[in-house]
């Protein structure tokens, strides 16, 4: 879980209604990682459910890190509020918060493992 309060102070928040697509698989707009402040977000790849993101969780990091199109679709399962973290802020957090960097690595590792085990 990401410390939402620590990054919320200086980041942009955006609200989504239930059913609204936050980003779609193949999108090339990969300028943000998203931290979920409230609500739930469903992640799916080729319409196959991958993960349900809960408050404090983050998503969209793969496209931000490797500058490739989005590999999945993120849809607001409920009304939700997300914090948008851009490239510069993401790299600042990784460099200045070892705990944040470790969390990102753990989540990436879990997601890769889950996708290769299925």
Feature map (PLM): residue ranges:
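Cyclic-nucleotide recognition modules
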Residues: 52-105
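Basic side chains
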Residues: 11-14, 70, 111-113
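Regulatory nucleotide-sensing modules
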Residues: 1-46
């Amino acid at each position: 879980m990401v410390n939402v309060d620590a990054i919320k102070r200086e980041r942009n928040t955006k609200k989504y209604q239930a059913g609204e697509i936050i980003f779609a698989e193949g999108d090339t707009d990969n300028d943000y990682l998203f931290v979920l402040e409230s609500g739930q977000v469903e992640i799916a790849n080729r319409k196959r459910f991958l993960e349900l993101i809960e408050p404090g969780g983050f998503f969209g990091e793969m496209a931000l890190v490797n500058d490739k199109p989005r590999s999945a679709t993120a849809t607001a399962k409920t009304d939700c509020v997300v914090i948008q973290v851009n490239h510069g802020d993401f790299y600042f957090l990784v460099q200045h918060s070892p705990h944040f960097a470790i969390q990102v690595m753990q989540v990436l590792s879990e997601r890769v493992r889950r996708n290769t085990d299925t």
